[in-house]
Amino acid sequence: MTMKKSRERHGFRATLALICASATAATATPLVAVDVGHTLQAPGAISARGRSELAFNHDLARKVVDALHALDVRTVLVNADGRIESLQARPASVPQADFFLSIHHDSTNASELTEWDWMGTPQTFSDRWAGHSMFVSTRNPDLATSLLCGRTIGARLQRAGLMPTDKNARRRAYLDAEHAVHAFDNLVVLYRAQQPALLFEAGVIKHRDEELLLRDEARQQRMAQEIATGLKACLTAGR
């Protein structure tokens, strides 16, 4: 073999190795399924000013997808049209995802609500509770990653000044009190998922002041960026 042919073969092998490495890196990029909680037929809680939880969920889920894209994390939006009726069908529709994140907004017990009039329409509110919280299931096949991602998201949110609520500790035990991660073992979208999964409650829409914050686009973007940053850190740790 001539020296020229040897160099050509070596160059080809080097190029092939680079292509393979690039393909491997692309494959290793995590895929996050972002689920819009609730449906058109069952739109969830109604805010203090009469807006459906589904509308809040859709707005934030879209921003989380955009924030993940900005960090070069692949995403798939689940229930974008609000028509997936089955909770089990949500994670089942994305078996290839590396993580399942379900976006929700919180309400308050009926016994804690007060009636008021908003723009001529009777509504209900409670200003007792405000803040985000998270849920994972110990029945999920990868509880460790589910909990780790909850912790990293919680840490990022609090570092940015977005504080959690302890409202849900009345019914759901903490797995990590500092970062507001609770156990919700029988929540279908969490334990039916084939991948680590977390349900995120962005805030309490029955709280009149927090509702306005949760509707603010700049704050939604800020929250989405912290969620995305925490989630990427969790999913790429050690890769």
Locate the predicted segments by residue:
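Bacterial N-terminal signal peptides that target proteins for export
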Residues: K4-T15
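Bacterial N-terminal signal peptides
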Residues: R13-A23
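Sec/Tat signal peptide C-region and signal peptidase I cleavage site
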Residues: T24-A28
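Accessory recognition modules or surfaces
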Residues: T29-P30, F99
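Short glycine-rich His-centered loop
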Residues: P30-G50
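Active-site-proximal helix/loop segments of hydrolytic enzymes
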Residues: A55-R239
